[in-house]
């Protein structure tokens, strides 16, 4: 097998469980990945995960596009499923809620725009612009089967549901 690395992140936060082991984890990982920074705890790394913003809303709100992809049309996830104004608006609402939850728990919280600027050096005035102008995301194909998709089967129960519970 082969792995294709499109881009190394400029910065990535990590934490250990339990958090008292953060220093040991950092001392080990920084040797192979010097861009890492210590987060307070895994709650901080979880709340700053952009997956629940990036994946469920575009997937669920664009099932007809996914059906076209399943039929063989060459479609791209970030280019064709992240649309304006509705999908972008829903994504922004999820991001706002995620940030509010993080602040309520006194965590160092980033918006998705902050995360993309820090992680990839990609900037823009809106989520739509950041996703459409991120050169590292251009090649990601649209999914072909919504029922076998990590974007739903993982992100919803393991990211959105906990966020809703904390909310």
Where are the regions a protein language model picked out?
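Rossmann-like dinucleotide-binding core of oxidoreductases
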Residues: 1-92
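Short, flexible active-site loops
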Residues: 73-85, 112-113, 140-148
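Small-residue-rich helix-loop
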Residues: 84-87, 94-136
């Amino acid at each position: 097998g082969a792995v294709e690395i499109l881009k190394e992140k400029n910065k990535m936060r990590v934490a250990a469980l339990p958090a008292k082991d953060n220093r040991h984890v950092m001392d080990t990982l920084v040797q192979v990945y010097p861009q890492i920074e210590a987060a307070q705890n895994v709650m901080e790394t979880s709340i700053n995960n952009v997956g629940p913003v990036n994946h469920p809303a575009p997937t669920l709100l664009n099932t007809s596009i996914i059906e076209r992809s399943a039929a063989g049309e060459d479609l791209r996830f970030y280019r064709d499923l992240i649309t304006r104004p509705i999908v972008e608006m829903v994504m922004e609402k999820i991001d706002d809620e995620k940030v509010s939850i993080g602040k309520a728990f006194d965590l160092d919280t980033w918006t998705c725009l902050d995360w993309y600027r820090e992680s990839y050096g990609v900037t823009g005035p809106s989520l739509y612009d950041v996703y459409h102008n991120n050169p590292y995301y251009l090649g990601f194909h649209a999914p072909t089967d919504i029922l076998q998709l990590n974007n739903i089967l993982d992100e919803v129960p393991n990211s959105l549901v906990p966020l809703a519970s904390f909310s």
